[in-house]
Amino acid sequence: MFYYKNWERFCESLSKCDVTLCTAEQSLRLPKGERFVVLKHDVETFVANAHRLATIEHKYGICGSYYVQAYLMSDSENIRLLKEMQEWGHEISYHYDVLDAHAGDYEAAEKDFIKYSKVFADNCFTYGTICQHGNPVKKRVGYTSNRDFFRNKEIRSHYPHLVDMVVNY
């Protein structure tokens, strides 16, 4: 069971360590060999819970990376909470699920990827990293996971500015 008081203790301890605490995007610009920690969160249901984690991290000067599923962007309260998190320095990015959503149809998946990326941009969330959503019980034919979307060289070539934290890191 998860307890916020334990997350608070963890963040407090982490803030005292001799290591760079950064977002996933910031980690890409660190000097080679620098020790760092990225707190990466997949936001798949409750933005309010993610906001609570971000509040604790912010208290200790930690900025995490929050990968948000696109459907959550349809709620104005979620957007408000995510914007506040972004103002604190947290990375708010896209937790994509497009290849599974379209049963391996890359063309349809890319259309959704473009559509949902625009939703993030229209709400002033810009990002340089993304992360795929994993669904271990999904039956797939012709592809192995959402990771395959950015493993596809043609699709990858359309987004040279993005780093998939699972595929490219």
Task: Map each language-model feature to its residues.
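Generic detection of intrinsically disordered/low-complexity segments and helix-coil linkers/edges
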Residues: 1-4, 89, 153, 163
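Active-site beta->alpha N-cap acidic-glycine motif
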Residues: 2-88
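An acidic- and aromatic-residue-enriched active-site/binding cleft used to recognize and process polar
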Residues: 26, 69-71, 97-99, 132-135
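Conserved, mostly hydrophobic/aromatic
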Residues: 42, 95, 130
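Hydrophobic anchor at the start of a short beta-strand
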Residues: 64, 92, 127
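Structural motif corresponding to the early beta-alpha repeats
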Residues: 69, 90, 94-107
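Catalytic domains of cell-wall/extracellular-matrix polysaccharide-remodeling enzymes
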Residues: 99-169
